[in-house]
Amino acid sequence: MGRDTIAEVLTVIRNANMDGKKMVKIPSSNITENIIKLLLREGFLENVRKHYENGNYFLVLTLRHQKTKKGPVTNILNLKQISRPGRRIYSMSKKIPRILGGIGIVILSTSHGILTDREARLEGIGGEILCYIW
């Protein structure tokens, strides 16, 4: 049975975010690097570093938090995996869902790489819906 790397990444980020942690370390792979680059570009992450340790590469993520008098308030509200190894979900470019009227993002795996819903609509291509972030 293979590992579901997308689910692992989303779960680690979600758990660290709920716990109020500032930094998270996740195993690096091509798909996780591309998803993390999208999250960084969309403003959900503050910083990303690639770290080599014991023969393996890791990504060290700095989560974005808003500080208040009561403590840090999380920036990422929800991460939801849509496509799973046992059930793949695909969408055409015109039927890509909008999350909260465009406030959230949909991450897709397309023939042009990992893209957000806005980029996929602009290019007019569909693909596998990996996750929703809002």
UniProtKB/Swiss-Prot annotation:
Keyword Ribosomal protein listed: yes
Subcellular location(s) per record: Plastid
Gene: rps8
Protein role: One of the primary rRNA binding proteins, it binds directly to 16S rRNA central domain where it helps coordinate assembly of the platform of the 30S subunit.
A GO BP annotation: translation
Family: Belongs to the universal ribosomal protein uS8 family.
Protein name listed in UniProt: Small ribosomal subunit protein uS8c
Assigned GO CC terms: plastid; ribonucleoprotein complex; ribosome
Quaternary data: Part of the 30S ribosomal subunit.
